[in-house]
């Protein structure tokens, strides 16, 4: 895997992209975290085809108001116990977790990073459980590393959730 400083820089870039789509009118972001690269940063030709299809579907809905898709974007992260979080997504996103432990999701508190041990479907989002108890203030990261895991949480259409980094966990 990549070194931690490089991963954190990737996380900051991915979070800036996600937030830009929330604050800049008519700007949309589509996920590419699950797509193959030909080197460290360039999408493969096959990935570009998938990316183009995603962009077209998102543009139909977000820019033209027609039937299409939108990128699953995390709305809120709410603590649901000593080790659990509720990950809330926008309307129209019936989310499906990655199988088994989700290596791409972490909580970070004063003691450091905590790995996700299980992620399950629940109405309106996902419920994630972590390997140890965590204390607030804490932050949530998903698919933020330079080299993300092979399996990511997706909505029912197959669109992966947007990466996020440093999202505040609410009580």
Annotated model-derived regions:
Residues 1-171:
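Cell-envelope and extracellular/periplasmic
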């Amino acid at each position: 895997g990549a070194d931690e400083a490089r991963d954190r820089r990737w996380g900051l870039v991915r979070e800036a992209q996600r937030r830009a789509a929330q604050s800049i009118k008519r700007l949309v972001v589509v996920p590419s975290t699950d797509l193959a690269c030909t080197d460290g940063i360039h999408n493969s030709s096959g990935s570009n085809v998938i990316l183009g299809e995603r962009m077209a579907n998102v543009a139909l809905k977000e820019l033209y108001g027609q039937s299409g898709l939108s990128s699953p974007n995390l709305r809120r992260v709410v603590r649901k116990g000593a080790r659990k979080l509720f990950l809330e997504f926008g309307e129209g996103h019936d989310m499906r977790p990655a199988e088994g432990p989700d290596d791409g999701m972490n909580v970070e508190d004063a003691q450091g990073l905590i790995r996700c041990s299980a992620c399950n479907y629940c109405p309106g989002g996902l419920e994630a459980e972590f390997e140890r108890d965590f204390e607030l203030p804490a932050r949530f990261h998903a698919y933020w590393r330079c080299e993300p895991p092979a399996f990511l949480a997706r909505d029912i259409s197959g669109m992966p959730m947007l990466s996020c980094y440093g999202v505040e966990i609410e009580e």
